[in-house]
Amino acid sequence: GALAELASKLKQTVLISHSQSGSFPLAAALIDPAGIAGMVLIEPGACPAAYTRDQIIALSRVPALVIFGDHLGDTPTGIPGFSWQTAFDGCQTFIERVKDAGGNAEMLHLPAKDIHGNSHMLMQDNNNLEIAGLILQWIETNAGKRKESHGTH
C-alpha cells in the first residue's frame, strides 16, 4: 500500500510507528522499500514472527530501530494473553533474524541506557525530548547512511 507509495513519493523517508501501528513500516518495506531510509518502531504491539526467510532478507535492506521503555512486566494491557514483555521478546527475536540476514536492526531498551520511568506513551513522558534525541541520533547515524548511498541528501 498507501504507506509504501507515500514513502516512494517522498523519497528516503524514515517511517515512525507506535504501538498497534508498529508493523505498518515493516509491511510498507515489504511492498516497496525504495523510498524508506529507515524504520523506528516505538513500543510496537508485535514484531511478527511469521516472516519467511525471504521477507526477513527484504526487511534487512532497511535499517530498523525498535524502542521499549521499562514497564514491560507491570502494565496491564487489557488484552487477554498479551504482555509488553511478550512484544519485547518477539521484537528481540525479529532483530536477531534481521541481523542474521545481514541487516541493521537494533533494540533501544531504555533501561539499558539508564533511562527509567517511561510509560507506553514515550512521546508524552517527561523525558520525551531525551528519547527524541536518541531517535534523531539513530536516524542520523543509520538512516542517513542509506540516504547517502543513494546519492541524495
Q: Which residue ranges define each predicted feature?
A:
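Gly/Ala-rich beta-loop-alpha elbow adjacent to hydrolase catalytic centers
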Residues: 16-25
